[in-house]
UniProtKB/Swiss-Prot annotation:
Belongs to the RecA family. Keywords: ATP-binding, Cytoplasm, DNA damage, DNA recombination, DNA repair, DNA-binding, Nucleotide-binding, SOS response. One of its GO terms (molecular function) is single-stranded DNA binding. CDD domains: RecA. It comes from Pseudomonas putida (strain W619). The gene is recA. ATP binds at residues 65-72. One of its GO terms (biological process) is DNA recombination. This is Protein RecA.
Length: 355
């Protein structure tokens, strides 16, 4: 750059700083670049598939899927993981369906959880914005976008037409809160439902509620599906779950993870540790026996997972090695598939070790 351009640029930068404050425009090379901080999802395979070890702070995340696919369970698991590090979490329960007892079983500290059950969509989004602007809340869950009913629709008659009201509400709210979320370094997760588009001949007829704004503003979008049942004999005790990362602005997208959700216990984390440990050569498997550093830890995956629950330090040690090996090496594609493959072969449901 020649001297005239340098002087002109310096003058422009000086004027911008005087008018808008220091830091309004910066050279990226003047500041040390750090990795994006993340909060674990509670699923080791999903954390690895996301590429940064969890969901990014300071961003908007959308989790959508059919009914009973595990959307709320996954978000409660995120809250439980965040609270372990002392984070303050809030749950905006627009569906008025949060079960504190179930949340407690998943590891959520219910006493410290902030809960709001707003009457209208405007109220829910205003509360969300105020919590973000407080700079004191680390994780906010909005459950769900479909339940953010505009005030005009609530006060109107049943059957009245309100075309595009919810989409306009979401678009306006997201324009307002996105910058605040980045400044507060707060993770905001919107749970969304699936609807069917009428008259679609080609491509998927599925779409999410609330218009297109959330699709654009979200840094990460997760499509969660129930793919099968976890059985103990004839009794169904859990769900086989697949999560596909359909959008990811912080790492390569379109990866997926598979894990199990056990009813009343949550994500079967110790099972994931065993399977990923075997796939990475950290846990030895000989026949039905599993061993770690030459010491047998159980016959069958269920018993090995139970051993990790009884010895959490060993489980944490194996998990740390898996994260370092996969995240630093960038070997993240299909990280959860190994966990799902062995899970179907073993009698996982016997384990009392839900985590």
């Amino acid at each position: 750059m020649d001297d005239n351009k340098k002087r002109a640029l310096a003058a422009a930068l000086g004027q911008i700083e005087r008018q808008f404050g220091k830091g309004a425009v910066m050279r990226m090379g003047d500041h040390e670049r750090t990795g994006i901080p993340a909060i674990s999802t509670g699923s080791l395979g999903l954390d690895i598939a996301l590429g940064i070890g969890g969901l990014p702070k300071g961003r908007i995340v959308e989790i959508y899927g059919p009914e009973s696919s595990g959307k709320t369970t996954l978000t409660l698991s995120v809250i439980a993981e965040a609270q372990k590090s002392g984070a303050t979490c809030a749950f905006v329960d627009a569906e008025h369906a949060l079960d504190p007892e179930y949340a407690g079983k998943l590891g959520v500290n219910v006493d410290d959880l902030l809960v709001s059950q707003p009457d209208t969509g405007e109220q829910a989004l205003e509360i969300t914005d105020m919590l973000v602007r407080s700079n004191a809340v680390d994780v906010i869950i909005v459950d769900s976008v479909a339940a953010l009913v505009p005030k005009a629709e609530i006060e109107g008659e049943m059957g009245d037409m309100h075309v595009g009201l919810q989409a306009r509400l979401m678009s306006q709210a997201l324009r307002k809160i996105t910058g605040n979320i980045k400044n507060a370094n707060c993770l905001v997760i919107f749970i969304n439902q699936i609807r069917m588009k009428i008259g679609v001949m080609f491509g998927s007829p599925e779409t999410t509620t609330g218009g297109n704004a959330l699709k654009f503003y979200a840094s990460v979008r997760l499509d969660i599906r129930r793919t099968g049942a976890v059985k103990e004999g004839d009794e169904v005790v859990g769900s086989e779950t697949r999560v596909k990362i359909v959008k990811n602005k912080v790492s390569p997208p379109f990866r997926q993870a598979e894990f199990q959700i056990l009813y009343g216990k949550g994500i079967y984390r110790n099972g994931e540790i065993i399977d990923l440990g075997v796939s990475q050569g950290l846990v030895e498997k000989s026949g039905a026996w599993y061993a770690y550093q030459g010491n047998k830890i159980g016959q069958g995956k269920a018993n090995a997972a139970k051993y990790l629950q009884e010895n959490p330090a060993i489980g944490a040690e194996i998990e740390k090695q898996i994260r370092e090996k996969l995240l630093k090496a960038g070997v993240v594609a299909e990280a959860g598939k190994a966990a799902a493959a062995d899970a179907k072969a073993d009698d996982v449901a016997d384990a009392d070790a839900g985590y």
